[in-house]
Amino acid sequence: MKTKYIKQLFSAALIAVLSSGVTSCINDLDISPIDPQTGGSFDQQGVFVKGYAMLGVTGQKGIDGSPDLDGQDEGESGFYRTTFNCNELPTDECLWAWQENQDIPQLTSISWSPSSQRTEWVYVRLGYDITQYNFFLDQTEGMTDAETLRQRAEIRFLRALHYWYFLDLFGKAPFKEHFSNDLPVEKKGTELYTYIQNELNEIEADMYEPRQAPFGRADKAANWLLRARLYLNAGVYTGQTDYAKAEEYASKVIGSAYKLCTNYSELFMADNDENENAMQEIILPIRQDGVKTRNYGGSTYLVCGTRVAGMPRMGTTNGWSCIFARAAMVQKFFSNLEDVPMLPADVEIPTKGLDTDEQIDAFDAEHGIRTEDMIKAAGDDRALLYSGVGGGRRKIQTDAISGFTDGLSIVKWQNYRSDGKPVSHATYPDTDIPLFRLAEAYLTRAEAIFRQGGDATGDINELRKRANCTRKVQTVTEQELIDEWAREFYLEGRRRSDLVRFGMFTTNKYLWDWKGGAMNGTSVASYYNKYPIPVSDINNNRNMSQNEGYK
């Protein structure tokens, strides 16, 4: 029963907020006040679940038609898709095939501006969600029953998480703690960092013990892991590092009831909310269901966006052919790209006889270009890449970004169950998104120990052991660490943050294909380590100032 708790409540939650009279505006974060006497009674359970649902849905009617955010592309404006795009598309992990799409070239080349719409989408989404959290907290102020106290702690956690995204992406936030028409004030750097830290400390006692919460709700381990993430990045956010606390809180998570999943791929399959092996690692998932939570963000984006028609075992009837691996990502598993299993140039792809998964598999197997061949060649179960002929002949790298087969396909996210049973929908995935998982604590502790001059090999090798990696690390280097973050967490919506922390996102310390718009990569101005405050909010909120470097 616990595993389905959040999904069962989603339907009611999707209508709870609008029926309460909440509105939003694309051009600023002004909101209309709620009068519970005219807007209907406060549905505490519905609004509470909506607080979690906003992580994975975009409105009140599923795919589209009644969006949270008026005036925006509903499919593009969800929490996960907007944060994912800003943290993945500019990095060494992936490319977007269709460079003519709005603002995509700017993300690819790290050249965005305050007028970029995709920057505005994530900014407004984070602000909208915080508005809903403030509404819930105002409505439940003074209530002292145990369940309400726990719900309030969880909503405060989600609000702190959103403020962390503001801090990480923008270096500041339009800050409010109450639901009102007052303009948000600017809170940035150390001040915002301290606020998030204090919030997490204050709410910890009222949260579930690790692994005691219904699957999909935040517990103390989620709190500790967000704190570990905050402390690991303290040098970026405040100018003062705090690796000792990062190590301390990562160790608390590792010492809790969570355990590593023994099969890496099962973490990203459609039954990761029922398969105990996967669930034991997933600390906080974004709940997804092919029937109840249909949307164009979330795991639909991750599965459909990485597939093209003709690929074997797509897991969806709708391949969008959008996201593929950069060569730099492939190099995390193959330092020499000549070792990547690829179809020889002199082998023609048959024009007939490749109509079924079985036929494509047979051809791929004959030439050693299946995903299982990739894993074997890499000596690492995490190398979930596809170089076969399903959907066309692929390249490893390209001199012009013109289509989906300009790089290897990433098949990490799947709409297949580990037990072989059917999924709930042929197009929209059931796959939950592990927003927080235990492996992050291992790499956080490894990096924190390394930064303090200690031996970090144990934690890295623990993850490599799980991945059946044939190469164990003997000596940890900074490059080995940043590469390991990619091997473990590629396409999970965090890469930019790691690169910024390592001083590699904008500098020539590390170049990758198409960084800065150059085929072989080039450095960019350091102010791109932060996103700009959207010009719309600068114009509408006199309290907000633009980040340095942007005009």
Swiss-Prot record:
Q: What molecular functions are annotated in GO for this chain?
A: calcium ion binding; identical protein binding; starch binding
Signal sequence, renumbered to the chain: 1-24
UniProt subcellular location: Cell outer membrane
GO biological process per UniProt:
starch catabolic process; starch metabolic process
Binding positions (D-glucose): D73, E74, G75, R81, W98, Q99, E100, N101, Y296, W320
Listed CDD domains: SusD
Q: Which keywords does the record carry?
A: Calcium, Carbohydrate metabolism, Cell outer membrane, Lipoprotein, Membrane, Metal-binding, Palmitate, Signal
- Does the keyword Glycoprotein belong to this entry? no
- Give the CC-aspect GO terms: cell outer membrane; outer membrane
Task: Explain what induces or represses this protein's expression.
Answer: By maltose.
- List, alphabetically, the Gene3D superfamilies matched: 1.25.40.390, SusD-like (1.10.3780.10), Tetratricopeptide repeat domain (1.25.40.10)
- Keyword Metal-binding in record: yes
Per the record, lipidation of type N-palmitoyl cysteine is found at C25
Subunit comment for this entry? Interacts with SusC.
Question: Which family, according to the similarity comment?
Answer: Belongs to the SusD family.
Question: Any notes on this protein's domains?
Answer: The binding pocket contains an arc of aromatic residues that complements the natural helical structure of starch and imposes this conformation on bound maltoheptaose. Binds cyclic oligosaccharides with higher affinity than linear forms.
Known function? Major starch-binding protein present at the surface of the cell. Mediates starch-binding before starch transport in the periplasm for degradation.
Q: What is this protein called?
A: Starch-binding protein SusD
- Its encoding gene is what? susD
